[in-house]
Amino acid sequence: MVNRRKVVVVGGNFAGLACAMKLSRRYEVTVIDSSPHFEFLPNIHELVSGVKTPDLLRLPRARLIRRMGHRFVQDRVTGLDAADGKARTASGQTWRFDACVVAIGGINNTFGLPGVEQYTLPFKSVDDCAAIGRRLVTLVESGRKVSVVVVGGGLEGVE
């Protein structure tokens, strides 16, 4: 049996899964992510409008990765040692690798604007959008006039 090179992919959403898929069966791939679910973010705005529910946008990450012939580890990476080829996780495990891909996604950039953290709701995950939807329902049911401001013109803001 041929010893395949080991690749650790940190992060299991779009970029991480695309990488794992591309690596196919030529490599022994371990995808490490703290969440058991892959979140289908292109339809995330449909949570706010109530067209979709959170469970429709979450898929079991382990099943998706197993279908590719790879291993999924639900854990949080706490350290990478590129020289030694090791990834350490919160549970205390160490995963050896010949190559490592870091695909942990992005964060909302508030550009240091005052009040952003206090007065806005993030739009980056299924939970974020479900919270926005609940907040809008509460505001509409209050009978008061509701104004919504979208800050940002990226894909999520446009949707």
Which residues fall in each region the model found?
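FAD-binding core/adjacent interface of flavoenzyme oxidoreductases
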Residues: 1-4, 69-147
